[in-house]
Regions:
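N-terminal hydrophobic/helix-forming segments and targeting peptides
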Residues: 1-199
Length: 199
């Protein structure tokens, strides 16, 4: 989060120009994309590594790539929703944004868009939205940290997750103890693990 983005180092060949590198970079941006300096005052810019995902390790057993933590969750969730045919109960897949900053903003889960969508869905089906929420189950997909012996104090070796040992299943989330915590009931955990023979 404290990295600086490198966007250019060549300067315009004019000794009288004070910000020669900046001018050269702006000229290139305008030539290639039609971007001017004024656009930066109102633009939403996301800078990400451009390389593709690649194998990691001598045995090529791991994957490294920008955004892979989100992709490995989003893709299976979306495909599960697409491939679900004639479900007994209505199924919904939510792919959302802004998780890294506390899920704030109009596209984060702290906003009301999912709640409003579910209300509209219930109304369209002629169902009571309060009862629908009370009878709903939600699973949240994310990655977790595998045990790292370099930072052993941050893990519980006998109750933690390890790389290469399958899917991790957590009944709670949160940070700094109980801050922003959500804890699934024992009944829900039991139902999911028994139904799918997870444990």
């Amino acid at each position: 989060e404290e990295l600086n983005v490198l966007i250019g180092s060549d300067a315009v060949e004019d000794a009288d120009i004070k910000e020669a590198v900046k001018l050269n970079t702006l000229m290139l941006l305008h030539e290639k994309y039609g971007i001017t300096e004024r656009d930066f005052t109102r633009a939403e810019i996301e800078v990400v590594p451009a390389h593709k995902a690649r194998d990691v390790g001598f045995d090529r057993s791991m994957v490294g790539g920008y955004g892979h933590d989100d992709r490995v969750d989003a893709y299976p969730a979306l495909m599960a929703e697409i491939e679900t045919k004639d479900p007994v109960h209505t199924t919904v897949c939510v792919l959302t944004d802004k998780e890294e900053i506390g899920s704030d903003g109009v596209t984060g889960m702290q906003s009301m868009y999912v709640f409003h969508f579910m209300q509209l869905l219930c109304r369209a089906a002629g169902q009571d939205d309060i009862l629908a929420f009370q009878n709903s189950v939600c699973l949240s997909a994310d990655v977790t940290a595998a045990y790292d012996p370099s930072w052993a104090n941050a893990f519980e070796p006998q109750n933690g997750t390890y790389a290469g040992r399958g899917v991790a299943f957590f009944k709670y989330t949160g940070s700094r103890g109980k801050s922003s915590a959500s804890d699934a009931s024992a009944e829900l955990v039991g139902d999911i693990t028994d139904r799918k023979s997870v444990v």
